[in-house]
């Protein structure tokens, strides 16, 4: 695996070099293309940098990385192999890779390349250049983030400490202004928080998240969109520490910021869903109303959706039913499940985990009401789907088989209350944690 990664990295360096080469295959008829071809390298570099920013702001990270690769090549042409600007181009490319999942190793490699170039570039007049020092902060921070993504927490913290120390020195020397330092410090504190969170040190992470949020609120405003991811990560740590009231409040604060920014229906639904989850996670009765309110709000945003929005609606609806069952509202949950069955068949197909689980829950509800015929019919349908999806030896299939076996003997043990009670337990309408709708894992076998 390591060998394949190294090969990929080697190939990737070739990609950067290849970006310099321009092969003239045919004459361009379009004057615009001819103009672009004969643009001076610095103009091309500026154009690529602008394109990369635009793609990144639009979350089109693959296209952004493609432009950043070209920037590295053009920067080498414009400034040479030993200029700090080339190191900066490598760091920008490393940041681009960090936005793509699974490419942290490439990001680390480019950050190391940048450090190597910078080490050979710090000679007069660079040693007096504030831009070089400001870039050095970015280099250490980017290296720290890359190491964090690779779960090398100690090395990540060391690089973040260097970035923090250098930023303070520049502030004290008057090389950067206070407002600029606050923006830098916000990013460094957030990365520190993520390092501690990665180490499962929630208490240490908490103070850094709080500091990061404070700095972002100062620099960007309390209702800026940049606050949302920090608020959610902060709330997650508070939740892990059992601070459910403040956790829910921070999730709500993030939700209100999202709503103030004219979100799409799906984005608004996701945000409300997060609040509902936080309220359920507290396990407290006083948060039940909050959970129901935001489940309902989430579903309202998606009610008339089609395609992916429709499947998301049905999944959230199932979680809401699970919540209702947990809070003793089983009849209401059963009614919603019955109404949802046809829509699930249409959205997921007849033979899907979602449909199988709904049949299982409805069968359990029928049994609880003494409707053995209805329970048997629904559980049989559930068993057919589970056998097809997971195989006859999967623990879910075996559990349904066992439940049907107990159901077939139910009339014979009607006079034995304790055994009848056990039979009902097997048909509990609560959704098991490892088989939440939409989370089923085909092929999982019995333990």
UniProtKB/Swiss-Prot annotation:
<keyword id="KW-0677">Repeat</keyword>
<dbReference type="GO" id="GO:0005929">
    <property type="term" value="C:cilium"/>
</dbReference>
<feature type="repeat" description="TPR 2">
    <location>
        <begin position="137"/>
        <end position="170"/>
    </location>
</feature>
<dbReference type="Pfam" id="PF13424">
    <property type="entry name" value="TPR_12"/>
</dbReference>
<dbReference type="GO" id="GO:0045880">
    <property type="term" value="P:positive regulation of smoothened signaling pathway"/>
</dbReference>
<dbReference type="InterPro" id="IPR019734">
    <property type="entry name" value="TPR_rpt"/>
</dbReference>
<dbReference type="InterPro" id="IPR011990">
    <property type="entry name" value="TPR-like_helical_dom_sf"/>
</dbReference>
<keyword id="KW-0966">Cell projection</keyword>
<comment type="function">
    <text>Participates positively in the ciliary Hedgehog (Hh) signaling.</text>
</comment>
<feature type="repeat" description="TPR 1">
    <location>
        <begin position="45"/>
        <end position="78"/>
    </location>
</feature>
<feature type="repeat" description="TPR 4">
    <location>
        <begin position="356"/>
        <end position="389"/>
    </location>
</feature>
<dbReference type="InterPro" id="IPR042621">
    <property type="entry name" value="TTC23/TTC23L"/>
</dbReference>
<protein>
    <recommendedName>
        <fullName>Tetratricopeptide repeat protein 23</fullName>
    </recommendedName>
</protein>
<keyword id="KW-0802">TPR repeat</keyword>
<feature type="repeat" description="TPR 3">
    <location>
        <begin position="186"/>
        <end position="219"/>
    </location>
</feature>
<comment type="subunit">
    <text>Found Associated with the EvC complex composed of EFCAB7, IQCE, EVC2 and EVC.</text>
</comment>
């Amino acid at each position: 695996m390591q060998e394949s990664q190294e090969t990929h990295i080697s190939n990737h360096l070739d990609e950067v070099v290849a970006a310099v080469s321009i092969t003239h295959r045919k004459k361009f008829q379009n004057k615009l293309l001819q103009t672009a071809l004969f643009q001076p390298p610095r103009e091309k570099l500026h154009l690529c940098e602008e394109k990369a920013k635009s793609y990144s702001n639009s979350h089109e990270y693959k296209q952004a990385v493609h432009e950043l690769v070209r920037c590295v090549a053009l920067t080498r042409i414009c400034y040479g192999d030993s200029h700090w600007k080339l190191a900066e181009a490598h760091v920008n490319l490393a940041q681009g890779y960090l936005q793509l999942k699974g490419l942290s190793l490439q990001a680390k490699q480019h950050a190391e390349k940048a450090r190597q170039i910078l080490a050979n570039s710090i000679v007069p007049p660079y040693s007096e250049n504030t831009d070089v020092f400001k870039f050095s902060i970015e280099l250490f921070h980017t290296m720290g983030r890359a190491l964090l993504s690779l779960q090398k927490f100690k090395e990540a913290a060391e690089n973040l400490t260097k970035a923090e120390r250098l930023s303070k020195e520049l502030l004290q020397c008057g090389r950067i202004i206070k407002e600029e330092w606050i923006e830098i410090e916000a990013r460094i504190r957030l990365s520190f928080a993520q390092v501690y969170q990665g180490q499962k040190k929630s208490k240490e992470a908490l103070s850094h998240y709080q500091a990061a949020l404070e700095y972002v609120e100062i620099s960007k405003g309390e209702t800026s969109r940049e606050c949302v991811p920090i608020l959610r990560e902060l709330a997650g740590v508070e939740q892990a520490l059992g601070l459910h009231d403040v956790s829910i409040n921070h999730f709500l604060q993030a939700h209100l910021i999202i709503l103030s920014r004219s979100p799409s229906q799906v984005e608004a639904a996701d945000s409300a869903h997060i609040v509902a989850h936080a309220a359920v996670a507290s396990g407290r009765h006083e948060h039940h109303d909050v959970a129901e309110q935001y489940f309902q709000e989430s579903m309202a945003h998606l009610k008339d959706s089609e395609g992916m929005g429709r499947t998301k609606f049905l999944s959230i609806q199932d979680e809401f039913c699970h919540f209702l069952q947990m809070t003793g509202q089983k009849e209401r949950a059963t009614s919603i499940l019955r109404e949802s069955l046809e829509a699930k068949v249409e959205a997921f197909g007849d033979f899907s985990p979602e449909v199988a689980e709904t049949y299982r829950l409805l069968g359990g509800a029928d049994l609880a009401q003494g409707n053995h015929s209805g329970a048997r019919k629904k559980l049989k349908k559930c068993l057919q789907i589970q056998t097809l999806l997971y195989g006859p030896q999967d623990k879910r299939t075996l559990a349904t088989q066992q439940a049907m076996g107990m159901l077939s003997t139910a009339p014979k043990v009607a006079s034995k209350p304790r055994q009848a009670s056990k039979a009902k337990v097997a048909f509990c309408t609560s959704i098991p944690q490892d088989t939440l709708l939409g989370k089923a894992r085909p092929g999982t076998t019995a333990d």
